[in-house]
Structures are given as C-alpha cells and as structure tokens.
Swiss-Prot record:
Protein name: Cytochrome b6-f complex subunit 4
InterPro entries documented for this protein: Cyt_b/b6_C, Cyt_b/b6_C_sf, Cyt_b6/f_cplx_suIV, Cytochrome_b_C_euk/bac
Keywords assigned by UniProt, alphabetized: Electron transport, Membrane, Photosynthesis, Thylakoid, Transmembrane, Transmembrane helix, Transport
Similarity-based family: Belongs to the cytochrome b family. PetD subfamily.
Localization per Swiss-Prot or TrEMBL: Cellular thylakoid membrane
Quaternary context: The 4 large subunits of the cytochrome b6-f complex are cytochrome b6, subunit IV (17 kDa polypeptide, PetD), cytochrome f and the Rieske protein, while the 4 small subunits are PetG, PetL, PetM and PetN. The complex functions as a dimer.
Pfam families reported for this sequence: Cytochrom_B_C
Entry's Gene Ontology BP terms: photosynthetic electron transport chain
C-alpha cells in the first residue's frame, strides 16, 4: 500500500494547472532533495549567523572578581530553588523541613488513586486534582516570593 495520493488526471482543474506548469506542488513537495539539501542548511546557517552576530554585537560582560573574604549578607540559591529554600529557612527543625519536601512527590504519586477518572476526561471536571494543583501552584509562588524577602517579613510578604 502506498502512502502517496495518486493524482486524479480526469479533474479538469488539475489538468489546467499541469498545462500551465503549476501543479507540481499540488500533492506536496518531496522531502528529498528539496528540504534536506536546500531548506535545512539555510536554516542551520541562518541560526549560526544569528548566534555569532549576537555574540559579537553584545558580548557578555564579566562580573566582579570573586573575593572569598567578603561574603554577601544573605546568599540566595537559583530562582527555581526559592520555594525549597523558603521551607528550609522557615521550619525550625531541619529534619521536619526535609520531611515536608518529601510529601510533594508522595502527594503526586497518590493523586491518581484519589480520583479514579478517565485520563482523557476534561481536567475542569476533576475538582480534587484541580484544587490540589491550584493550591500547590499558589503555595509555590508564595514561598518563592517569600524567599526573596528578609526572614522576618518572609511569611507575611511584608504586608502585615
């Protein structure tokens, strides 16, 4: 069985296009050699030219030299670790902080067993999963913002 669509040469519109030399792209353009030999190298070379051009026109500036004898007042981790950092910073017992972080993957593993629904169903018709997802999202954003603030203002976000 062929995957190519056979042209209907009895179609007068197609015959008129073929007579004018316009019908060769009517059923698709072949990948070999058109895409692989002509289009892909142009895209690859264009991407390389853009990267090299941006590197030449806007080089990255070097930061201050490292001084091991002058540490900053508060060392912050990368932005994606802010919620975890906030949990470890706020919880008084560090072992409890690590235990709280293990609840996140455990909750994600238990979630499919809480709501036994079809995986193709509408997610808005799954109230438990949606409420847990929204709670986790807002908690992560709240903890991430709190990690950027001093510890005395981190839980209230400086609002109270």
């Amino acid at each position: 069985m062929s995957t190519l669509k056979k042209p209907d040469l009895s179609d007068p519109k197609l015959r008129a296009k073929l007579a004018k030399g316009m019908g060769h792209n009517y059923y698709g353009e072949p990948a070999w050699p058109n895409d692989l030999l002509y289009i892909f190298p142009v895209v690859i070379l264009g991407t390389i030219a853009c990267v090299v051009g941006l590197a030449v026109l806007d080089p990255a500036m070097l930061g201050d030299k490292a001084n091991p004898f002058a540490t900053p007042l508060e060392i912050l981790p990368e932005w994606y670790l802010y919620p975890v950092f906030q949990i470890l910073r706020v919880v008084p017992n560090k072992l409890l902080g690590i235990a709280l972080q293990t609840l996140i993957p455990l909750g994600l593993m238990i979630l499919p067993f809480i709501e036994n629904v079809n995986k193709f169903s509408n997610p808005f018709r799954r109230p438990i999963a949606m409420s847990l997802f929204l709670f986790g999202t807002f908690l992560t954003i709240y903890l991430g913002i709190g990690a950027c603030l001093p510890i005395d203002k981190s839980l209230t976000l400086g609002l109270f």
